[in-house]
Amino acid sequence: MHEIEVNRNSHLIDPQLHIWGWEVPVYLFLGGLAAGIMIFSALMGDRFPLEQRSRWARWLPFAAPLLLSVGMLALMMDLEYKLHVYRFYLAFRVTSPMSWGSWILLGIYPATIGLGLANLQAGEVAALGSWGPLRLLKGAIGWGHDFASRHRRGVQAANLVLGLGLGIYTGVLLGTLGARPAWNSALLGPLFLVSGLSTGPP
């Protein structure tokens, strides 16, 4: 029997496994944290009146888009073709978890900002509108507060649905990868959702 030892390593011939850098784990953690914040903030609205909540609890929804933006920036750094991101928003494919996730991420910003504005008291709305660069948006902040306050139940429902979608879609996306047998499971979506809730506010 002859033994052949091969010392070459060609990515065009030999199978390669791509190992994630720090960018993807950062996005997964911050995305799960944002999902937990959205879900708990939405559920808190039905259980605790605004008068019984601390200032931190009322301002908490604003943290979700900030955390998500940092996570998406990290994810963008991991992409090879960064200029092609816009193509996700040129179509919607019902059978594609990545397409669902792209549109969910887009809807999170108005939903979380609306819930945050609805939670503010009158004095806080005025203070927010007079702070630094937000002075240019003072009128929009006041209008957003009035609109979100009138439609509070709808805004809470949007945060709950989008938070659940954000928490579960990444697991569903990874679960469709047949090349990773350990990931190819229907349990991965609920697992990501529970993990996201565990990182949310207590």
Name these PLM-found stretches:
Residues 4, 11-26, 31-32, 36, ...:
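An N-terminal structural lobe/cap that precedes and organizes the functional/catalytic core
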Residues 21, 28-32, 45-52, 57, ...:
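Long, contiguous internal "core" modules enriched in hydrophobic/ aromatic residues
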Residues 33-45, 68-70, 111-116:
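Central hydrophobic cores of alpha-helical transmembrane segments in multi-pass inner-membrane proteins
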